[in-house]
Regions:
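Short loop/turn segments that flank or connect secondary-structure elements
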Residues: 1-238
Length: 238
């Protein structure tokens, strides 16, 4: 699908904060099987680790796997599906074992969200004024016995409408992904592997769950950008 068609599809499924949708979770567990696409951001890893009283590295090593996004050129972490039904590793007896700390994509289902940036700002590399948009996903489980607004649904899960952690994460993906894309053109595969490992460690795993998440993310992102700027300087001579 072309970027233009993707944009049209997003617009078609976008739903306003006070628009309504019908959905009722029946705890059937269907949304937790045949899943290879439960992607985690650093805050998801942090929250799950805190819930399980372990480290983000423990969660990553025991329940996740990673790959490099074909369009983002960025390390992507997903929950590693188990068994022939490809179930979420946290699905236990048809219930979520980390319900109180479930990944954001699971918590807001059947909604999804994306970050919209003005086209002129994007062309100029200005990511400072994004707007968080919400969309309705195809609903393949539960029933339609309850009606909600987007605002009500998110409030029920204590998710802010303007989720700063979500915004900052996607800003960094866009900014760092652009640098990594250029690096791929000039650096050898082994060097790129080390660079991607550095991104994975600093942005996804380098957190103390006894401390607040966002200040640590900002520090990690700053440290990573300093390292990438050094790489950019090196690439000028390649």
């Amino acid at each position: 699908m072309s970027m233009e068609n993707i944009a049209k599809d997003l617009e078609a499924r976008t739903i306003g904060l006070d628009d309504t949708f019908r959905f009722h979770c029946t705890a059937c567990g269907k949304c937790c099987i045949n899943r290879e696409d439960i992607l985690l951001n650093p805050r998801d890893l942090y929250r799950i680790a805190k819930h399980l009283n372990c480290t983000p590295l423990d969660v990553y090593q025991n329940y996740c796997e990673s790959y490099i996004g074909s369009s983002s050129h960025f390390p992507i972490v997903r929950l590693k599906p188990k068994g022939h039904v490809k179930r979420c590793p946290f699905l236990k007896d048809r219930k979520c074992a980390v319900h109180e700390a479930k990944p954001g994509v699971c918590a807001i289902y059947p909604l999804g969200r994306y970050m919209k940036i003005d086209s002129d700002d994007y062309k100029q590399g200005n990511l400072d004024n994004p707007v968080v948009k919400y969309l309705i996903q195809p609903i393949e489980c539960g029933d339609n016995s309850c009606e909600h607004t987007v605002r009500e649904w998110l409030s029920g899960f204590n998710i802010a409408l303007e989720d700063q952690a979500f915004i900052r994460w996607h800003q960094e993906i866009a900014k760092i992904g652009s640098i990594l894309k250029q690096a791929e053109k000039k650096l050898s595969a082994p060097v790129m592997g080390k660079l991607w490992d550095t991104v994975l460690i600093l942005l996804y795993l380098n957190y103390d769950v006894t401390k607040d998440y966002l200040p640590q993310f900002e520090e990690n992102a700053s440290d990573l950008m300093t390292a990438l700027q050094t790489v950019q300087t090196m690439m000028k001579g390649v």
